[in-house]
Amino acid sequence: MELLSEDQVERVLEWYEKDPGEALVGDEPLDTIPLADLVALFRPDAEDPEMHLVYEVEPREVERLQQAVQHRIDLDAHDYFVAAYRTG
């Protein structure tokens, strides 16, 4: 996996319809949460230390993520994921 500098990566919170639709409903950037905080929160495998993969949001992560987004996170209404995208 190619290592990218932090200014080349944007991490976002994405929410999708629950089954059966699974369509993307919305997203918000997570640029106010430092990578170190996301790593501590999601505990990625050693193969993905910079969180370039997609992570499903579980109840224990909601409180910290909610501090960074305007959308009200509702795990009963949507499926949530933290994803990383290359910028530029």
Where are these regions (language model features)?
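Short consensus segments that form the blades of beta-propeller domains
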Residues: 2-5
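Short coil-to-beta strand junction motifs in C2/discoidin
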Residues: 7-9
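A short beta-strand micro-motif
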Residues: 11-16
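Solvent-exposed strand-loop boundary residues in beta-sheet-rich modules
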Residues: 19-21
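Short, flexible N-terminal segments of the mature chain
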Residues: 23-47
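Acidic, low-complexity intrinsically disordered segments
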Residues: 42-88
